[in-house]
Curated annotation (Swiss-Prot):
SMART domains per UniProt: Brix
Organism of origin: Debaryomyces hansenii (strain ATCC 36239 / CBS 767 / BCRC 21394 / JCM 1990 / NBRC 0083 / IGC 2968)
Presence of keyword Ribonucleoprotein: yes
Domain of life: Eukaryota
GO MF term set: RNA folding chaperone; rRNA primary transcript binding; single-stranded telomeric DNA binding; snoRNA binding
Protein's UniProt keywords contain ATP-binding: no
Example GO biological process: ribosomal small subunit biogenesis
Gene: IMP4
This protein's name: U3 small nucleolar ribonucleoprotein protein IMP4
Length: 284
């Protein structure tokens, strides 16, 4: 009987302590929500509370399969990519768009004509396009590449640098239509992994092991070098032949919506006019 009473008392005290801890944590959570709603700074006690830090992780939000815009495409279905240009393109931009089409298997090239963005997005939704790529230029030089994923985003904008077309490269090789192997190097941050996911889902899955085609994306100080090669195995070595095009990309903006939604949330944007704007590496 004495042992039973002692056990019951310990259990009661334990439950009581849990209730007190839970009520204290609930009160702190309410204080935290009130501070967030009003915009007031957190008290030192709330800011340093480890239990609350487990509940509210603001720097790296947890991603689930429901949040993943590419879960339907991942390794199952082939992407359907539409490539177009800005209106009234120059000869060089048209040629660049043709060479970009050769990089993405099963892609479609569309002459822009008088299409505005809203009509272009509506057309892509109607024919079940998975990704839309738009190339822009300034005075005949390709300057930006925009990718918008359907049906609900994201949309990503890269600036283009040092664009070399196939005829600008020495000893150019012949391009193949086989599915390419993809190489991504030095994309170690969460933003870098996000960029990799967007880029790799432009290419179809199911690459054969004996495919001799390789497309490489190498991040160096947030400039992504894009190279397109064919390789041939000899007795002792592997010989690479560049087939082009060759260019560098720099991430400018990442939005959560489609191109026609001007009010979509900006997930990330390059801001150069801050103290660390040109010194910090964001992709890796």
């Amino acid at each position: 009987m004495i042992r039973k009473q002692a056990r019951e008392r310990r259990e009661y005290l334990y439950r009581k302590s849990l209730e007190l801890q839970e009520s204290s944590l609930t009160e702190k959570r309410q204080q935290l929500k009130a501070a967030l709603a009003s915009g007031k700074p957190l008290s030192k006690e709330l800011a340093e509370d480890k239990e609350l830090q487990k509940d509210f992780i603001y720097d790296e939000s947890e991603q689930t399969e429901i949040d993943d815009e590419y879960s339907a495409l991942s390794g199952i279905s082939e992407p359907k990519v539409l490539i177009t240009t800005s209106r009234n393109p120059s000869v060089k931009l048209l040629q660049f768009s043709k060479e970009i089409k050769l990089m993405f298997p099963n892609s479609i090239k569309l002459n822009r004509g008088n299409y505005v963005i809203t009509d272009l997005v509506a057309t892509c939704q109607r024919v079940q396009i998975s990704d839309l790529i738009i190339l822009h230029e300034h005075r005949g030089i390709p300057t930006s590449l925009t990718i918008s994923h359907f049906p609900h985003g994201p949309s990503i904008i890269f600036t283009l640098h040092n664009v070399k077309l196939r005829h600008d490269l020495p000893e150019i090789g012949n391009s193949s239509e086989s599915y390419p192997h993809l190489v991504f190097e030095n994309f170690t941050s969460e933003l870098g992994k996000r960029v990799v996911k967007i880029m790799k889902h432009l290419f179809p899955p199911g690459v054969k092991k004996d495919s001799s085609r390789v497309i490489t994306f190498i991040n160096n100080d947030d400039f992504i070098s894009v190279r397109h090669h064919m390789y041939v195995k000899t007795k002792d070595t592997v010989e690479l032949s560049e087939v082009g095009p060759r260019f560098e990309m720099r991430l400018y903006e990442l939005r959560l919506g489609l191109l026609d939604n001007k009010d979509s949330e900006v997930e990330w944007q390059l801001r150069r006019f801050i103290r660390t704007g040109n010194r910090k590496n964001y992709l890796g």
